Regions:
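Gram-negative outer-membrane beta-barrel transporters
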Residues: 386-387, 477-481, 495-564
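Short strand-turn segments of transmembrane beta-barrel domains in outer membranes
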Residues: 173, 177-208, 219, 226-231
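Flexible loop and strand-edge segments within Gram-negative outer membrane beta-barrel domains
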Residues: 224-231, 235, 245, 249-325, ...
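Conserved C-terminal beta-signal and adjacent last beta-strands/turns
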Residues: 19, 230, 243-246, 427, ...
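Extracytoplasmic beta-strand/coil segments of soluble accessory domains associated
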Residues: 82-131
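Surface-exposed extracellular loop regions of Gram-negative outer-membrane beta-barrel proteins
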Residues: 269-270, 359, 403-409, 415-417, ...
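Membrane-embedded beta-barrel scaffold of Gram-negative outer-membrane proteins
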Residues: 213, 299-313, 350-353, 418, ...
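Short acidic/polar hinge/loop motifs at secondary-structure boundaries
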Residues: 131-158
Length: 625
C-alpha cells in the first residue's frame, strides 16, 4: 500500500512540476534588498552567541555560524529547522514529511551537532533572543514551534555552550535572533505559497517603528495532506514583540509566541503491523519581559520568561501532559580594565510537569504526579586582548546548581590569534552538560530517579583565511568525549554510556564576479557509537546565488549525505538533493517565487520507515506594503 501511494505521489508531483514551470520566473525576496555582503562571508560578522554581547565572530575562540534571513528564505522552507538542516557543517535535523516534524512515537525534528544531541533532542539548546526554549517535561524543544517569518538571522554555536547557557547546551546552541525595525515607518508583508501534496503556507507580518517604540507581529498558517494518505499536518502560529527605549541607556521589551499543531501519522503503526492512526494536538506558548541597559563601558540585561505546553496524543490510547517553566536571566558585561571585557551572570529556572493520563488510564505506568526541578547558576567570563588584538584570550566558569543534581563546575578556555589581517587561528576547550529529563527520571519502566547529569569535553582548532572577496575559508577540527551518558541496561536507565566523536569541518565562500555568490561546506564525523541516528558520517553543500538580470534571481544548491545510520535492518543512507529556486521582482511591492526540491528524485529516508518526498514544487507571492 505504501509503495503504491509513493508512485501516485510521484505522478502528482510531476503534474505539479509541469504546472509551475511557467511560473518559475519567480521569487523569494526582492533583489533590491540584496547586497554584496549577502553571501560573501563574513570576516567581520558580529554575533552575540558565545559572549552575551555583540562581538566579531573571529574574535571568539569558539565556532559560530550565522545564517541570515535571505539564506533562510532561499530554501523555500517556513519551518526554521528544515531551512537550517544541512546548511551548517556538522548540523543535521531529522525529517519525515514535506511539512511537519511531529512529536512522540514516529516524530522527527531531532537535532544533532557533531553527533551530539540525544534522542529526543536534549543536548542542543534552542534559544530565541537568548531565551532558552524546551518543553519542561521532556527537556527538548518542539521542532514545529519555530518558523522563519520573524527571524533576522540564526547563530549556531558548534560545540558546548554550557558556561554561558547552562544545561542542554552540551553539544551546541541555536540562537534565533528576531527582526527589529531599523527605521521609522510601518512595514507589512504577506507571503503565500502552494504546491505539492496540497501544501499551503501563508504568513502575515507587520513591523513598526515610531520614535522610541517598535513592534513586530507575525501570524502564520501551514497545512499539507502529506506524502501518503492520512499523513496530514497543520499549524497556526503567532509571534509578537514590542520594545520601548526608556532613555539612551535603558530599553524595555516584551514578547509572546503561541503555536497550535495538529497532525496524523499512519506510518508508525504500519511498521508494527497495526492499523491505528496517531493523532497529535499540541499547544505551546512562551512569553518574556526584558530590561536592558547600555553605557559606554558596560551593558547587560535582566529577563523574566515563562513557557507552557498542553499535549494531547492518541497512539492509539489517550495521552495528556502539561508542563511549564519559569526562569530569570541576568548578566552584565563590563570593561574590566584596558582591552579586557568581563561578564558576570546568573540564571534561575524551575520547570514542572505532570501526566494526568497515559495509555488511556489515569493511573499506572506512564502517568506522573506533579514533579519539579529548580536550577540556579552564577557564571563568569573574561576576554583579554593583547598586542593590539593580535592575540585574544578567553575563559569562563559556571557553577551549575540544582535541587536535584547538586553542584557541577563547568570551565571553558580558548584563544584567537591574528598574525595578519587575513589569517586567524582559534582554539578552545569547553565542558558541556545536560541534566536528566523527567522522562528518564520518573517515566516508564526504565526510569531511574538516581541519575546524574551527562557531560562532554570538547577540543577544537579553527583556521580562517580570507584571500579577498574571491575566497574565504574556514577549517575546523574537533574531538569530543562524552561521559555519564544515560543508556538503558537490564531494563533500567543508568549513567554507563560514553562516546568519542571527532571530525573535520570546511566552509568556503566566494564572489568570483559581480552578481554571483558561491558557497560550499563539508563535514566529516567519526563516532565510537555505531548506532547513532541523525548523524551522517559525511555531509556537504554546494550552493550558488546568481542575479543574471536586475529583477531576476536564481538560487541552486546540492546537498549530499553519506553514511547516515537509520536502523540495524536498514542500509546506511547515501543521497544527493538538487534544489532550485527562482525569484522575480515584479515591482517594489510584489515578488513571485518558486522552489523545486529534490530534482534528483532521490529515494531516501531519515526516520526508519518514513520515506522522504521525491520531486516537490512550491510557488507563490510576497506582497510588501
Amino acid at each position: 500500500m505504501h509503495k503504491g501511494n509513493h508512485h501516485n505521489s510521484l505522478t502528482n508531483k510531476a503534474k505539479t512540476l509541469f504546472l509551475f514551470l511557467p511560473f518559475a520566473v519567480s521569487a523569494t525576496q526582492s533583489q533590491a534588498t540584496l547586497s554584496d555582503s549577502t553571501y560573501v562571508h563574513q570576516i567581520e560578522q558580529v554575533v552575540v552567541t558565545g559572549s552575551n554581547q555583540a562581538t566579531s565572530r573571529n574574535l571568539l575562540p569558539y565556532t559560530v555560524s550565522v545564517v541570515n534571513a535571505r539564506q533562510l528564505e532561499t530554501t523555500g522552507k517556513t519551518q526554521l529547522l528544515s531551512a537550517l538542516s544541512g546548511v551548517v557543517p556538522s548540523m543535521f535535523v531529522s525529517q519525515r514529511n514535506i511539512l511537519g516534524f511531529g512529536v512522540s512515537n514516529g516524530g522527527s525534528g531531532g537535532i544533532k551537532i557533531r553527533g551530539v544531541g540525544g534522542s529526543p533532542t536534549n543536548g542542543i539548546l534552542m534559544m530565541v533572543d537568548g531565551q532558552p526554549q524546551f518543553a519542561g517535561l521532556f527537556s527538548h524543544p518542539i521542532a514545529d514551534y519555530y518558523t522563519t517569518e520573524y527571524v533576522d538571522h540564526v547563530e549556531i554555536l558548534r560545540g558546548p555552550g554550557s558556561v554561558l547557557y547552562g544545561s542542554n547546551a552540551m553539544g551546541g546552541v541555536i540562537n534565533v535572533i528576531s527582526k527589529n525595525a531599523q527605521h521609522d515607518g510601518i512595514h507589512t508583508t504577506l507571503k503565500s505559497q502552494y504546491g505539492s501534496n496540497n501544501t499551503w503556507q501563508t504568513a502575515l507580518s507587520n513591523m513598526v517603528r515610531k520614535g522610541r517604540f517598535s513592534s513586530l507581529v507575525t501570524m502564520g498558517y501551514d497545512r499539507t495532506d502529506g506524502i501518503v494518505e492520512i499523513f496530514d499536518f497543520k499549524q497556526i502560529n503567532l509571534y509578537a514583540k514590542i520594545g520601548y527605549e526608556l532613555s539612551r541607556y535603558f530599553r524595555l521589551s516584551a514578547d509572546y509566541s503561541l503555536v497550535n499543531i495538529k497532525g496524523n501519522d499512519p506510518i508508525y503503526a504500519q511498521l508494527r503491523n497495526a492499523s491505528y492512526i496517531i493523532h497529535q494536538n499540541i499547544t505551546r506558548g512562551e512569553t518574556s519581559l526584558a530590561f536592558s541597559n547600555k553605557y559606554q563601558n558596560t551593558d547587560g540585561a535582566l529577563r523574566f520568561y515563562y513557557s507552557y505546553g498542553n499535549h494531547y496524543i492518541d497512539d492509539p490510547k489517550h495521552f495528556h501532559s502539561l508542563d511549564d517553566r519559569f526562569g530569570i536571566i541576568a548578566y552584565q558585561n563590563v570593561n574590566v580594565w584596558q582591552h579586557a571585557t568581563g561578564t558576570i551572570g546568573f540564571d534561575f529556572n524551575t520547570y514542572r510537569g505532570k501526566i494526568p493520563m497515559s495509555g488511556g488510564s489515569t493511573s499506572g505506568a506512564g502517568t506522573l504526579e506533579h514533579k519539579s526541578i529548580t536550577e540556579y547558576s552564577p557564571y563568569l567570563t573574561l576576554q583579554q586582548s593583547l598586542f593590539n588584538d593580535i592575540l585574544i584570550l578567553n575563559g569562563g566558569l559556571r557553577m551549575a546548581n540544582s535541587d536535584k543534581f547538586g553542584t557541577h563546575w563547568l570551565p571553558q578556555v580558548g584563544f584567537s590569534f591574528h598574525p595578519t589581517e587575513h589569517w586567524c587561528l582559534k582554539a578552545s576547550m569547553a565542558k558541556g552538560y545536560r541534566n536528566p529529563s523527567f522522562r528518564e527520571l520518573y517515566l516508564y519502566p526504565p526510569h531511574n530517579p538516581g541519575l546524574d547529569p551527562e557531560s562532554i569535553m570538547n577540543y577544537e582548532v579553527t583556521i580562517n583565511h580570507r584571500f579577498s572577496r574571491y575566497l574565504n575559508t574556514d577549517i575546523t577540527g574537533y574531538f569530543a568525549q562524552g561521559r555519564n551518558i544515560i543508556q538503558t541496561q537490564n531494563g533500567k536507565n543508568n549513567n554507563t554510556g560514553s562516546f568519542r566523536n571527532k571530525g573535520l569541518e570546511l566552509s568556503v565562500t566566494s564572489q568570483p564576479i559581480d552578481k554571483l555568490w558561491l558557497r560550499a561546506s563539508y563535514s566529516y564525523m567519526h563516532s565510537s557509537l555505531k548506532e547513532l541516528t541523525a548523524a551522517p558520517k559525511n555531509q556537504y553543500l554546494i550552493g550558488a546565488n546568481w542575479q543574471p538580470l536586475p529583477r531576476f534571481n536564481i538560487d541552486v544548491e546540492l546537498k549530499g549525505v553519506g553514511g547516515l545510520y537509520i536502523a540495524n535492518e536498514v542500509a546506511r543512507q547515501n543521497y544527493a538533493l538538487l534544489n532550485l529556486g527562482f525569484t522575480y521582482n515584479v515591482t517594489s511591492y510584489i515578488d513571485l517565487f518558486a522552489h523545486l526540491d529534490n530534482l534528483t528524485d532521490a529515494d531516501y529516508m531519515i526516520n526508519n520507515g518514513y520515506k522522504m518526498p521525491g520531486i516537490t514544487c512550491m510557488g507563490g507571492f510576497k506582497l510588501k506594503l
